[in-house]
């Protein structure tokens, strides 16, 4: 066989011939399919002539195919040929031509099948590849995506072709970037390169086409064909599209995608940087431009999610600056760019960012500032970024103070919206300028030869201080706030200028005072200062180190130590600044005649702080004013005071003096007293000029003020006046005392006491001998004071007691006679003013002792006076021990059972020890050799034994008193032999008191035990400790003897535990000491545990103990591992007493709480886990609270998986599975047990802890935490699912569900295996979590359907928003078919069997979600779900029905055909049973909404039902339902065409309904027929019309029923298009006539109306019959009940008024319809009938008109109009018939002969009709006048037809109209005026012949 070129050419010729002979598309298609690929293959021929011939053939084929668009081309074979390895370029050229021509002609399924081949063709020529890619773009929106996920990923089969995949995705991205409406002539759009723009603009899409392509691309990207990483960037671009249809699905998919992407992976974020700024390619054609602002906005939103390695500093910098200053940007972009910059500064690689940090700072500063034009939100973001910059790179900020200055200025002048962000920026900058940040060699360089408090600042610091000085007194609060932050952060706390400015702010701004006070004093309230935490720089020696600054900035503000500045430095600075202010006269305040440099508030702040500095510089570490340390202050003043202007103490005295001169206050008076009390000889004489203002203040209403003034006044008199002057002033004061007011007398009495106390002390100090008994002024003062003790005013008694205390302590009181006033014993009147007094003579000592002791005993005396009286007795024993010591001790023992009051007992204890010691124990022993000779060792021993014996007294009053007294005696008399000898006895006594019911007595006893232990030597301490532990743990308390006055329980102590027993701190402490095998530690613990409020007050100051010694702390160190966990648990004990005590111990033992807790974290957690289920409820609560606090770490949960080496579990740990975090799982397990506790408080605490733990677990399991997150999730998720979600306790279920819900976002993939259990549990829980109140309201509203449905709708929305449903929504994306199949039985059971509304709603909603998620994949299960939902739409609750209807709508598109048919059948059956069931319509509506095409396929089933249902009789109940059916009809089959096209299925439905036994269904079918007749009118086919008429005629037979009139109305509607000559017409009229004769009035009314319509349409002559059957109705006066019931009332007298009105209205309506029917039945073509009735009708109408009601009159005139319109006699050609030949004309009931001629008849009719018109004209009724004018118009129209006829009727009309015109014109209605105008126009045109 020949194989050369000729043979090939011959073959090609044959092919050409075959193609030429193909004379049809089918033949051409067959030829092309057979020969095209072999012909193209010939392109590989080596012979040129062959190739030429091939081109000829191919050109012919191309030309033929171009004109025949339906001819298919063998695309698949061409693709295989194109992809073959040996294909030449020529071959590929032609193959690509035919591929691009043939691919669009293929069916969609074929295109989908070939997609992988089209995309996968590897070719070096990009243009060819682009052409192939372009073939797929238009079909992506319609391409069928496989349901199987594995098949989806293989749809394009690009797994092994990464280059092609990347190229295809790049093309998709370029298309998404292409703007709408762009043309080739325009520039390259943002985001594209010239090459990419060229290749996609060639497609020349219109905007709508491009939108469709983009929608297809997004749909394809969301179909899981590519990996998440590959589709991420294209979807971000799509989400920025301007068309809603493109952006919305992209945004939805991105929200799912972002939970799965790892934003710490550079591969995720690198394309974002590139797209944002362009690819910077070196090839110009491939260089992409930066993208547009919309896309940038989206890119930045995802760049902000970058973490770790994905933060690219170089590109990030380019992105941010392009976002700030680039061209393609907007406001939102700038904000996001700044947020990204903040991320860059915070989380970027520090070493790289630090290199460009100054550049970043410059960029930020350009955006903000006073001159910035940027919007507020941009500036806010810039300030936030600046704040982060300052935190990350403080060195950049610290080099430019102008920045801070500028922002301070901005803060003062900017809009309020910027305040918070500028403040944040400034506050972040403050640490950059902090003194502590300088190098120690520079910043802390202090000249050791100079004062240690001097601070060396650099120039920056000085400039900053100057700026802060300007801003400290700013009028803008936030400026002062920021200033205070700088002052507290940038300077050492002992730096005086900074403290000075802070004090200015505290005084001026109330809102900042608390904060500033915290920095200055270590606490927010001045009366809460912990003075042990304060120290002065003067006594810190070399403590000027960074440590103090660190404490200042980092420790808890309430616990940190405070370093006070040197008093001299501080005072010098204050003095300097005050002098400057006074000279400048700025900000000065004038008070009285004194000019102050500061306001009174600022002055007070300065004085308080200066006073504190003074005392601490003097070496005192205690509250200022403490008498024990006055000598130290005296030494300091004596050493440093000089009477020169530059002396700090002199300046202080002047500063205080100026304040006192201006206005006396507590602060300045106490400051003055400090100076005078410490060094009176230095200051008293210089302050005498203050006596006058101070004397005026003695009248002040404030008692405190008078007391403060009196002590100052007393010192000034004693030390400032000479002896003679002193005696003179005192004498004058005493003489004038009786004439002064009460307050004035009180003040002067105190002055006398203070001045004698000071004067006597001064005399003794100077060793001057003076006989005090012979000092007249002194003796006189004692007498007056003694008399005042007996006064009735408590104020004077209080002053007298204080005076006796002051004088009695200083000297023996002279025993002189005195006359006092006492109340008469026989006085019965209780009124003090009416009490009679008797004078008696006595001595001063007798009076004083008796009265003071009586005040102490008296329960009616004021508390303060009783305490002062107790102390007074002790002071008397100091001054006169011989007289008072023995008496005091005897009397005190009688006071044990007085009122139980801690403060009073402490006061008595002070008096006892003062009496025993012979000196004021608060001031200390006068000298070491001092011995109280009035109380020797025997007396002391006897008194001590008496106290110990009273310990066993069961009286609670006595036990409290003895405990306090015994403690005081042991503390202050510890060196007495009796105390040392009775240590063990004292321990037993205190141990006995330790078991008392009173917490206070327990505290006192524990302090006593500690004291006894501390005064013992080391040998006996061990014995005491073992003995104590034995008593506390093993011993038993002796039973108290109960007497009649015994108080069994202290107030507030009963019922503190479930058993009624008393809880003590010491039980826990003993247990701890015993476990440690260190009995002596109990003393340390007890010592630390006491913190009773009474002890922390000034009253208990005498019993305060030192903190833990260094030796004891060192001893505890080895045991901290056991002590710390136990103490940590004890801290949270719910018993306040124990909790506070343990916190006290903790604070003392633990120096840094955070560090210690972190060190012993696992030990503490083990302690808490072991005790979480302890048998005592308070321990369980404590553990719950402690766990919550332990877990609350700044860094989140502490995990085992994060530790370098896993630690072995302790032996006593719970048996748990091998999980990464065993403690975490055990903690959940234990908490669940406690949440099911019997004790409510325990359950509440456990619930709070579990909720908090859930939040921590959610954070810890986040994907951001990598492996540790996985460890947390895998440890707890299975447990929560297995145990928590299905737990019987609702709270446990809620916590579990909430935790799982929140965890799904972060660790969702781990949840998948448990979904079959989880989903049903969540659905069940949805119902249980429902608000019971809403459920109750719904039940109560059962009678009101609308209200109940509204409430149930709220319940449903609430159920959908519960976290259970949110969790289900998150879980859905992890459900596949196998999981759904497993859970289906339980879900279906819930749908059918649950009674909770929430569960039912949740199930329906879940069905909707899962149908969207799985689609066709769930088809096998859809039938089951549809059956369950069908049960739901029959539910009694409307809301449940609605949601199940929606669920069916979702499911039906996925169902099998059999299920669909079955559902539609059931819906029809359900409608037949429950026509009012709204859910049927809702179901069909839902199906139509989601699967419109499906409903079209089953239109024959549903359309008749919809059409029939929409014609239900509407009433209040069914109105909404009918509207819903109508809306559904309009959606499904709008317009008349829908009815016409579906009549073949609608009529059978109506036929069956009309033959139904139900009357309502008959009426409903009639309504539907009426609609058909009305809408289709003449277009209704005659067979269908006749079929319907016959149906109605059949239905009309039989008795009357409710709704039967609808059949007549439908029949009337059908007659409108009926042939009038059809034989059925007579049947129709006969049926209507028959129904019109029925007697029931209402039905007869409607039947007559329908009859009128029928006769009018058919133009039949039945007037006579109609007239005969209805005329009698017009003559009726009242309507009688047509009934056979004899009991029915018939006469109007027997009826009620309402019934009579109702009958009258019915009769009137009947008459109206009769006239309408008569008018319509007036024959149009029957001349004989007209002539027989024409005169009669006109005359009778006129006669009846006047007697009728208005509506009837209107109907009558309307009938007359129709009568005139159809009257044949008005025609010019009309002939009067010979009535003799036919029936005689109807006789008129008058004597006149009837007119014979036409003219006479016309004239007669006109006369009668115009009479009716005239009557109507006079009636004030617009409707009546309108009809009358219509008659006139009709008469003119009919009679003006011929110009040559009789003009008489027209003249009559004109005369009648003109005569009645005025009456017509009275009505101003527009229609009346319009008709009058028409009539006038017509009459004016007529020219009647005369």
From Swiss-Prot:
Q: Which residues carry this modification: Phosphoserine?
A: 1213, 1683, 1692
> Under the cellular component aspect of Gene Ontology, which terms does the record hold?
cytoplasm; nucleus; proteasome complex
Leader peptide range in chain numbering: none
Q: Which InterPro entries match?
A: ARM-like, ARM-type_fold, ARM_ECM29, Ecm29_N, HEAT_ECM29
Q: Which UniProt keywords apply?
A: Cytoplasm, Phosphoprotein, Proteasome, Repeat
The record's listing under Pfam families reads: ARM_ECM29, ARM_ECM29_C, ECM29_N, HEAT_ECM29
**HEAT repeats (start-end):** 6-29, 30-67, 130-167, 226-263, 294-330, 334-354, 355-395, 459-496, 498-523, 524-561, 565-602, 685-722, 776-813, 843-882, 938-975, 980-1018, 1118-1155, 1159-1196, 1271-1309, 1313-1350, 1378-1415, 1416-1457, 1497-1534, 1541-1578, 1583-1620, 1623-1660, 1751-1788, 1826-1863
GO MF annotations in UniProt: molecular adaptor activity
Q: Which residues carry this modification: Phosphothreonine?
A: 1691
Query: Which BP terms from GO are recorded?
Result: ERAD pathway; proteasome assembly
**Protein location:** Cytoplasm
Q: Where is this region: Disordered?
A: 1680-1702
Subunit structure, briefly?
Associated with the proteasome.
Query: What PANTHER family does the database record attribute to this sequence?
Result: PROTEASOME ADAPTER AND SCAFFOLD PROTEIN ECM29 (PTHR23346:SF19), TRANSLATIONAL ACTIVATOR GCN1-RELATED (PTHR23346)
Protein name (database record):
Proteasome-associated protein ECM29 homolog
Taxonomy of origin reads: Eukaryota, Metazoa, Ecdysozoa, Arthropoda, Hexapoda
């Amino acid at each position: 066989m020949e194989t050369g070129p000729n043979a090939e050419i011959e073959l090609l010729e044959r092919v050409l011939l075959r193609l030429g002979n193909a004379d049809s598309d089918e033949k051409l298609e067959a030829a092309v399919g057979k020969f095209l690929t072999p012909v193209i293959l010939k392109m590989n021929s080596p012979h040129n002539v062959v190739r030429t011939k091939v081109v000829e053939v191919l050109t012919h084929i191309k030309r033929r195919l171009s004109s025949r668009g339906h001819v298919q081309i063998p695309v698949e074979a061409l693709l295989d040929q194109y992809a073959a390895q040996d294909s030449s370029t020529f071959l590929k050229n032609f193959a690509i031509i035919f591929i691009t021509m043939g691919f669009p002609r293929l069916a969609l399924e074929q295109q989908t099948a070939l997609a992988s081949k089209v995309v996968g063709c590897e070719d070096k020529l990009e243009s060819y590849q682009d052409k192939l890619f372009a073939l797929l773009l238009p079909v992506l929106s319609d391409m069928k995506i496989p349901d199987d996920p594995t098949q989806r990923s293989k749809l394009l089969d690009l797994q092994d072709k990464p280059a092609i995949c990347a190229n295809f995705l790049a093309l998709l991205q370029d298309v998404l970037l292409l703007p709408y409406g762009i043309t080739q002539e325009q520039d390259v759009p943002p985001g594209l390169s010239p090459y990419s723009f060229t290749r996609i603009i060639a497609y020349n899409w219109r905007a709508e086409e491009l939108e469709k392509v983009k929608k297809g691309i997004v749909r394809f990207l969301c179909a899981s064909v590519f990996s998440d990483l590959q589709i991420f960037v294209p979807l971000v671009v799509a989400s920025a599209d301007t068309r809603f249809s493109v952006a919305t699905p992209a945004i939805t998919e991105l929200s799912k995608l972002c939970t799965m992407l790892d934003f710490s992976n550079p591969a995720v974020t690198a394309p974002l940087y590139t797209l944002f700024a362009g690819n910077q390619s070196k090839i110009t054609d491939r260089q992409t431009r930066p993208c547009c602002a919309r896309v940038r906005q989206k890119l930045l939103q995802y760049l902000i999610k970058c973490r770790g390695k994905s933060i690219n500093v170089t590109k990030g910098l380019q992105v941010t600056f392009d976002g700030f200053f680039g061209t393609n940007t907007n406001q939102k972009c700038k904000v996001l760019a700044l947020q990204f910059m903040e991320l860059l500064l915070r989380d970027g690689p520090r070493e790289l960012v630090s290199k460009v940090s100054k550049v970043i700072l410059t960029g930020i500063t350009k955006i903000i500032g006073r001159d910035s034009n940027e919007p507020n939100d941009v500036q806010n973001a810039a300030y936030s970024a600046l704040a982060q910059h300052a935190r990350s790179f403080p060195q950049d900020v610290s080099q430019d103070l102008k920045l801070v200055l500028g922002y301070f200025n901005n803060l003062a002048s900017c809009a309020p919206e910027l305040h918070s962000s500028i403040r944040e920026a400034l506050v972040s900058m403050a640490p950059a300028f902090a003194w502590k940040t300088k190098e120690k060699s520079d910043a802390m360089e202090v000249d050791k030869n100079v004062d240690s408090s001097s601070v060396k600042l650099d120039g920056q610091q000085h400039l900053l201080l100057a700026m802060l000085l300007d801003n400290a007194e700013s009028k803008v609060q936030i400026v002062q706030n920021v200033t205070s932050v700088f002052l507290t952060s940038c300077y050492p706390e002992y730096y005086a200028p900074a403290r000075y400015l802070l004090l200015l702010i505290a005084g001026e701004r109330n809102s900042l005072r608390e904060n500033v006070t915290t920095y200055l004093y270590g606490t927010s309230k001045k009366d809460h200062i912990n003075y042990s935490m304060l120290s002065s720089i003067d006594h810190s020696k070399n403590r000027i180190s960074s440590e103090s600054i660190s404490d200042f900035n980092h420790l808890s503000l309430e616990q940190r130590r405070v370093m006070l500045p040197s008093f001299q430095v501080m005072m010098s600075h204050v003095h300097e600044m005050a002098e400057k202010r006074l000279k400048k006269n700025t900000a000065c305040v004038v008070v009285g005649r004194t000019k102050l440099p500061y306001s009174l508030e600022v002055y007070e702040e300065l004085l308080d702080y200066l006073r504190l500095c003074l005392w601490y510089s003097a070496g005192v570490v205690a509250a200022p004013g403490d008498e024990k340390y006055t000598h130290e202050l005296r030494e300091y003043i004596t050493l440093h005071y000089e009477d020169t202007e530059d002396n700090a103490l002199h300046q202080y005295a002047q500063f205080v003096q100026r304040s006192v001169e201006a206005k006396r206050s507590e602060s300045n008076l106490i400051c003055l007293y400090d100076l005078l009390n410490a060094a009176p000889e230095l200051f008293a004489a210089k302050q005498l000029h203050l006596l006058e203002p101070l004397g005026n203040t003695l009248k002040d209403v404030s008692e405190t003020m008078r007391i403060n003034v009196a002590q100052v006044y007393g010192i000034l008199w004693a030390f400032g006046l000479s002896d003679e002057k002193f005696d003179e002033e005192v004498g004058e004061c005493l003489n004038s005392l009786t004439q002064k007011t009460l307050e004035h007398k009180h003040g002067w009495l105190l002055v006398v006491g203070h001045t004698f106390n000071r004067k006597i002390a001064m005399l003794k100090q100077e060793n001057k001998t003076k006989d005090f008994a012979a000092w007249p002024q002194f003796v006189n003062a004692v007498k007056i004071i003694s008399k005042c003790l007996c006064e009735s005013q408590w104020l004077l008694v209080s002053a007298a007691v204080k005076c006796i205390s002051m004088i009695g302590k200083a000297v023996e009181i002279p025993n002189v006679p005195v006359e006092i006033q006492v109340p008469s014993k026989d006085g019965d009147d209780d009124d003090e003013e009416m009490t009679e007094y008797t004078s008696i003579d006595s001595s001063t000592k007798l009076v004083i002792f008796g009265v003071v002791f009586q005040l102490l005993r008296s329960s009616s005396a004021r508390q303060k006076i009783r305490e002062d009286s107790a102390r007074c007795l002790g002071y008397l024993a100091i001054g006169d021990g011989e007289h008072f010591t023995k008496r005091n001790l005897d009397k005190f023992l009688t006071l044990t059972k007085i009122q139980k009051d801690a403060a009073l007992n402490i006061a008595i204890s002070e008096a006892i020890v003062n009496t025993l010691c012979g000196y004021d124990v608060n001031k200390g022993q006068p000298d070491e050799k001092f011995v109280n000779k009035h109380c020797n060792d025997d007396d002391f021993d006897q008194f001590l034994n008496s106290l110990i014996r009273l310990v066993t007294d069961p009286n609670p009053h006595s036990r409290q008193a003895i405990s306090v007294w015994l403690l005081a005696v042991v503390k202050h008399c510890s060196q007495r032999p009796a105390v040392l000898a009775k240590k063990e006895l004292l321990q037993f006594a205190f141990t006995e008191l330790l078991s008392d019911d009173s917490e206070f007595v327990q505290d006192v006893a524990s302090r006593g035990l500690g004291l006894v232990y501390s005064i013992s030597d080391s040998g006996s301490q061990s014995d005491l400790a073992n003995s104590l532990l034995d008593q506390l743990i093993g011993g038993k308390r002796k039973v108290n003897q109960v007497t009649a006055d015994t108080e069994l329980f202290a107030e507030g102590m009963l019922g503190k535990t479930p058993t009624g027993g008393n809880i003590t701190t010491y039980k826990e402490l003993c247990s701890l000491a015993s476990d440690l095998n260190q009995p002596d530690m109990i003393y340390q613990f007890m010592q630390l545990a006491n913190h009773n409020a009474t002890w922390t007050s000034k009253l208990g100051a005498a019993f305060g103990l030192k903190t833990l010694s260094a030796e004891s702390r060192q001893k505890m160190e080895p045991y901290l591992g056991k002590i710390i966990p136990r103490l940590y648990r004890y801290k949270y004990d719910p018993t306040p007493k124990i909790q506070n005590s343990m916190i006290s111990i903790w604070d003392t033992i633990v120096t840094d709480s955070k560090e210690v807790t972190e060190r012993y974290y696992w030990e503490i957690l083990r302690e808490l886990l072991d005790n979480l289920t302890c048998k005592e409820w308070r321990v369980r609560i404590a553990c719950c609270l402690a766990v919550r606090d332990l877990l609350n770490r700044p860094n989140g949960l502490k995990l085992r998986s994060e530790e370098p080496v896993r630690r072995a579990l302790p032996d006593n740990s719970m048996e748990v599975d091998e999980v990464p975090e065993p403690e975490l799982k055990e903690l959940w397990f234990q908490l669940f047990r406690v949440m099911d506790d019997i004790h409510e408080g325990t359950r509440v605490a456990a619930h709070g802890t579990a909720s908090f733990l859930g939040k921590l677990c959610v954070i810890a399991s986040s994907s951001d935490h990598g492996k540790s997150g996985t460890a947390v999730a895998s440890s707890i998720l299975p447990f929560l699912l297995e145990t928590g979600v299905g737990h019987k306790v609702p709270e446990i279920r809620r916590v579990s569900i909430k935790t799982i819900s929140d965890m799904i976002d972060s660790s969702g993939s781990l949840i998948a295996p448990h979904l079959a259990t989880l989903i049903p549990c969540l659905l069940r829980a949805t119902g249980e979590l429902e608000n019971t109140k809403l459920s109750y309201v719904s039940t109560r509203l059962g009678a009101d359907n609308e209200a109940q449905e509204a409430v149930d709708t709220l319940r449903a929305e609430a159920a959908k928003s519960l976290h259970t449903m949110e969790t289900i929504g998150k879980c859905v994306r992890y459900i596949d078919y196998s999981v759904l199949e497993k859970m289906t039985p339980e879900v279906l059971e819930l749908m059918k069997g649950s009674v909770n509304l929430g569960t039912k709603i949740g199930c329906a909603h879940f069905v909707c979600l899962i149908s969207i998620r799985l689609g066709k994949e769930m088809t096998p299960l859809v039938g089951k779900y549809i059956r369950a939902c069908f049960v739901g739409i029959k539910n009694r609750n409307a809301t449940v029905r609605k949601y199940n209807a929606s669920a069916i709508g979702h499911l039906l598109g996925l169902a099998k055909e059999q299920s669909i048919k079955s559902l539609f059948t059931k819906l029809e059956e359900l409608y037949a049973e429950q026509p009012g069931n709204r859910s049927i319509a809702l179901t069909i509506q839902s199906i139509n909404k989601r699967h419109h095409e499906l409903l079209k396929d089953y239109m024959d089933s549903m359309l008749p039902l919809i059409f029939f249902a929409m014609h239900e009789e509407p009433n209040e109940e069914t109105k909404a339902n009918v509207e819903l059916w109508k809306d559904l009809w309009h959606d499904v089959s709008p317009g008349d065409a829908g009815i016409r096209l579906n009549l073949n299925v609608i009529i059978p439905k109506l036929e069956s309904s009309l033959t139904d036994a139900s009357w309502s269904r008959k009426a409903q079918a009639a309504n539907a027929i009426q609609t058909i007749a009305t809408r289709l009118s003449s277009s209704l086919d005659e067979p269908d019309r006749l079929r319907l008429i016959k149906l109605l005629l059949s239905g009309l037979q039989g008795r009357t029923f409710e709704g039967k009139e609808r059949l007549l109305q439908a029949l009337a509607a059908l007659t409108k298009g009926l042939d009038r000559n059809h034989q059925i017409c007579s049947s129709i009229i006969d049926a209507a006539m028959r129904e019109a004769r029925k007697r029931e009035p209402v039905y007869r009314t409607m039947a007559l109306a329908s009859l009128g319509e029928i006769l009018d349409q058919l133009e039949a002559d039945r007037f006579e019959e109609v007239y005969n059957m209805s005329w009698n109705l017009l003559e009726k006066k009242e309507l009688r009940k047509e009934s056979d019931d004899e009991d029915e009332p018939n006469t109007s007298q027997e009826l009620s008024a309402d019934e009579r009105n109702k009958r009258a209205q019915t009769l009137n309506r009947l008459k109206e319809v009769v006239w309408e029917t008569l008018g319509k039945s007036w024959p149009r073509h029957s001349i004989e009938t007209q002539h027989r009735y024409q005169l009669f009708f006109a005359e009778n109408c006129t006669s009846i008109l006047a007697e009728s009601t208005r509506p009837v009159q209107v109907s009558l005139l309307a009938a007359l109009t129709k009568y005139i319109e159809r009257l044949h006699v008005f025609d010019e050609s009309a002939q009067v018939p010979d009535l003799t030949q036919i029936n005689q004309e109807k006789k008129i009931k008058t004597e006149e002969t009837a007119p014979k001629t036409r003219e006479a008849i016309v004239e007669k009719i006109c006369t009668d009709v115009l009479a009716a018109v005239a009557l109507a004209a006079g009636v004030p009724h617009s409707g009546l006048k309108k009809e009358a004018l219509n008659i006139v118009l009709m008469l003119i129209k009919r009679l003006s037809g011929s110009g040559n006829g009789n003009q008489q009727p027209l003249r009559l009309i004109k005369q009648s109209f003109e005569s009645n015109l005025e009456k017509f014109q009275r009505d101003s209605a527009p229609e009346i005026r319009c008709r009058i105008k028409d009539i006038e126009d017509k009459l004016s045109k007529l020219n009647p012949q005369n």
